[in-house]
Amino acid sequence: MPRYPFRRFGFGALRRLLYLWVRSETINQSAFTLKIDRSKPVLYVLQQPSVSDLAVVDTECRKAGLPRPVMPVAVGDAIEPAAFFYLTPEPDWLGRQDKRGASPTLVRMLAAVGQNGLDDAQIIPVSVFWGQSPDSESSPWKLLFADNWAVTGRLRKLARILILGRKTRVQFSAPIHLRELVEQGKGHERTLRMVNRILRVHFRNLKTAVIGPDLSHRRNLVKGLLRAPLVRQAINEECESERISQEKAEGIALRYANEIASDFSYPVIRFLEVILSWFWNKLYEGVKVNHIERVQDVAQGNEIVYVPCHRSHIDYLLLSYLLFRNGLTPPHIAAGINLNMPVIGSILRRGGAFFMRRSFKGNQLYTAVFNEYLHTLFSRGFSTEYFVEGGRSRTGRMLHPRTGMLAITLRSFLRDSRRPIVFVPVYIGYERVLEGRTYLGELRGATKKKESIFDLFKVVGALKQRFGQVWVNFGEPIHLDQFLDRHQPDWQDQDLGPEYRPDWLPQTTNLLAKDVARHLNDAAAINPVNLVALALLSTSRQALDESALARILDLYLALLRKVPYSPSATLPDGDGQALIEYVKSMNLLAEQKDALGRILYLDEQNAVLATYYRNNVLHVFALPALIASFFQSNSRISREQLLRFARALYPYLQAELFIRWSLDELDAVIDQWLAALVEQGLLRQENDTFIRPAPSSRQYVLLILLARSVTQTLQRFYMAIALLLNAGQNALTAEELENLCTVMAQRLSILHGLNAPEFFDKSLFRHFIQTLLDLRVLRKDEAGKLSYHELLGELAEGAAKRVLPAEIRLSIRQVALERPAEEAAAESNDAAAN
């Protein structure tokens, strides 16, 4: 080892020879962000003796300007010949190695701090990864080359360097201060054992986070599923219900298991990384990643479940690519069975995808096998990924979460909670979504088509377009044990039954789903396209003078900087004019020049598509827009009135858009927004009353444009309420009301020239009706007919009256009154049938 000058000379020659081939980098710039005190001794610790690992660490230290491990270091009055040691001591001349022994260097350092008065010493754990790959016994190539959990021999190490040396990554971890451990007063021997134990656990957890847990043979894993008690029970029940033999039922279960299970392959991961690196650089202008340190903080020692929003088929690939590039194990990804097609399915499966059917209903054996497979992933520490929205959002909104996968995760955790589960929300924001043209027809009201990976190939002709950037924000993690402690404090002491399906599971799963959706929206990446779409769609003809558009964008940026939506949300750089130039460069804006300047507008195709990008961030602006709405029909309003009516409307906005603030927090947040609007000149305050600007002023126009962001949402609320009140008590079922609302919205969109198909989106009415039921404003009788509380009338004539202009309310009431309920319901049912 290079502890003395002659050896250091030989080591330097070896390092230069090694780097004729090897290329290395630090994971997440960890060498450049170390917080060390250079006035105190710094030593590096590596897990196993390895000259090649040491050479890589020495090179990365030179790059980062850190103290080099092969150089002497002063320890009080003594000099250590080198500033590194191995956790597992080096073998002696006969090749014998005491794996339980302690490094002599560590013993001396601890003695210097504990007994000889040295102020402190800093120990920096360093890990070198020659490629990243979970081990799989079925692949001799992986066993020979990839970093894994097996003991590494010299021949294998050489092969690994030759095969994987150009993809070498180094992780520098935070320093361990020996002074802090010595001050615990446990004595030299116990402190030494404690330091060794801390380092062993650290290296094990880091290795799990970076290369994944030790994978067993896939064939053994699949067969192991069939031996699980719950699967055995399902097999026996299948035999009885279908009157088939045990062997045949086991064959069916085995077929299900093989259909489901992923087959992680390091060569495929590396292949995809190369392809995707080219793809992002070719198609997009880079990927901006924010808050990934949150994942790195929780990856060690926890089971990570990534829950991204779902906007595009490339979401699957993007997240795995980013995690791999940042030194984290790509997750096992839940994918729809429709993607398990020849060639594509095999690549996805080897890239970590496991496949699931859209519905498990009526197939208890499949359900048992799938649940057991997920439980195996969770209990063994494999990170996983699934989309709580179910499918891709065609409207740009956060879809209402599907609770199936969350319920399976919850039940698995109740079954075995030894390994904590942490949900990591991931917001993926595109400035131009790849499937935009596919979504365009659906936004115009065409029937939703079945999802297929081949949708991606339909956009090949559009690859000459500029797609801008992709933004990936990691949200605030949700610790499942802490979530259960809040909502079911005695969950660990309850008798959960043989299937781990307590009575409170459905309600708790729904609460978890809403939490995940809100955390996803909290991490919104607000980009230039979102803001321009929001501004132009708030005008009557989707057009604005360029200088006016720049002022609106500057206003939006100023408001969001004054009252940030959440610590996880991000804003674009630049001012309003810079944002306009950027969006123009993407050919999303049309322009017309005249003597007074330039008018920017959205053509018909881009106007419909712009609703998608506006909807990405509608939840961010919903509350200030609601506040602004109170001044469309009122020149002034007291704070007390505004708060009262806002409290009445907010629960419905929150339920539809998954807005982050609770009702208890609402008053304080509204006060912040009122102060921001006053600061920007959009409101004026006199004592406890807020006054809008003069209608002829520029500030008034800005205020009204802000209010229009949520006008269509409030109109839909008012429509449903007006139809209910007009029909009377116990006259309509929820389904009849939903259909009636859809027909009415379609008619209003024709009458008022609204080019926004989502205005009559049936699912939005369905969820609004469900929210009214959840809040007990509506009730169902035995026949399913709806009765309403007197609060409904107050909502219509109190709150709605103050946020919707009189002409809009009149138009809605006229349409509701002109059509007898029975006739409209019949027509709506005909429309539904067609």
Curated annotation (Swiss-Prot):
One GO BP annotation of this record: fatty acid metabolic process
User: Where is it found, in Gene Ontology cellular component terms?
Assistant: plasma membrane
Q: In which pathway does it act?
A: Phospholipid metabolism; CDP-diacylglycerol biosynthesis; CDP-diacylglycerol from sn-glycerol 3-phosphate: step 1/3
HAMAP family membership: Glyc3P_acyltrans
The record's NCBIfam families line, in alphabetical order, gives: plsB (TIGR03703), PRK04974.1 (NF003441)
Its localization reads: Cell inner membrane
The membrane topology term of the UniProt record is: Peripheral membrane protein
Q: Which InterPro entries match?
A: GPAT/DHAPAT, GPAT/DHAPAT_C, GPAT/DHAPAT_LPLAT, GPAT_PlsB, Plipid/glycerol_acylTrfase
Q: Which Pfam families match?
A: Acyltransferase, GPAT_C
Highest rank taxon of the organism: Bacteria
Designated name of the protein: Glycerol-3-phosphate acyltransferase
| Key words, A-Z | Acyltransferase, Cell inner membrane, Cell membrane, Lipid biosynthesis, Lipid metabolism, Membrane, Phospholipid biosynthesis, Phospholipid metabolism, Transferase
Which EC number(s) does the record attach to this protein? Answer: 2.3.1.15
Q: What is catalyzed by this enzyme?
A: sn-glycerol 3-phosphate + an acyl-CoA = a 1-acyl-sn-glycero-3-phosphate + CoA
Q: What GO molecular function annotation could you give as one example from this UniProt entry? A: glycerol-3-phosphate O-acyltransferase activity
| Assigned protein family | Belongs to the GPAT/DAPAT family.
Record flagged with keyword Lipid metabolism: yes
Where the protein is mainly located, per its record? membrane
What information about domains appears in the record's comments? The HXXXXD motif is essential for acyltransferase activity and may constitute the binding site for the phosphate moiety of the glycerol-3-phosphate.
Question: What is this protein's gene name?
Answer: plsB
Per the UniProt entry, what species is this protein from, by scientific name?
Pseudomonas aeruginosa (strain UCBPP-PA14)
Look at the named UniProt entry and state the broad enzyme category this protein falls under.
transferase
State whether keyword Methyltransferase applies. Answer: no
Q: Where is this motif: HXXXXD motif?
A: 309-314
